[in-house]
């Protein structure tokens, strides 16, 4: 498998892990995608128009999103992907749409994930950092 194919499989697994009907997610799948020390950051704009960010480790992300996933059908569908590689690092721009089912006509929101990966000597490609922003 090429580097691009390996990275693509990681991104596909990340989307599959968080997508599904209301209920629990299988967080053990994070090890297939992320390094243990990975960071994830959600960004938004507050009511006064100021940029905001919440940075989380893997456990923090689980705790932050589990109540939402338990109560809501949620499917994040990738709409575009660009992979840039240099040596043992890679960057992926991954556009997405959030929906209540994979083929729902109504899109709840769109955005982009900025994903940085590192080629680990034992694990292969894994996500080291990820930040996302929704369209406004």
Sequence positions of predicted segments:
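Short, cysteine-centered beta-strand-loop-beta hairpins and adjacent loop/turn segments enriched
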Residues: 70-71, 98-108
């Amino acid at each position: 498998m090429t580097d691009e194919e390996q990275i693509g499989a990681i991104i596909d697994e990340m989307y599959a892990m968080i997508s599904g009907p209301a209920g629990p997610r299988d967080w053990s799948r994070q090890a297939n995608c992320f390094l243990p020390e990975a960071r994830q950051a959600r960004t938004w704009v507050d009511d006064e128009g100021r940029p905001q960010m919440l940075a989380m480790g893997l456990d923090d992300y689980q705790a932050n999103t589990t109540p939402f996933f338990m109560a809501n059908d949620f499917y994040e569908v990738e709409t575009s992907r660009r992979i840039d590689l240099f040596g043992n690092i890679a960057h992926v721009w991954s556009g997405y749409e959030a929906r209540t089912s994979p083929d729902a006509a109504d899109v709840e929101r769109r955005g982009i994930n900025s994903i940085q990966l590192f080629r680990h000597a034992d694990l292969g490609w894994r996500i080291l950092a990820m930040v996302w922003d929704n369209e406004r």
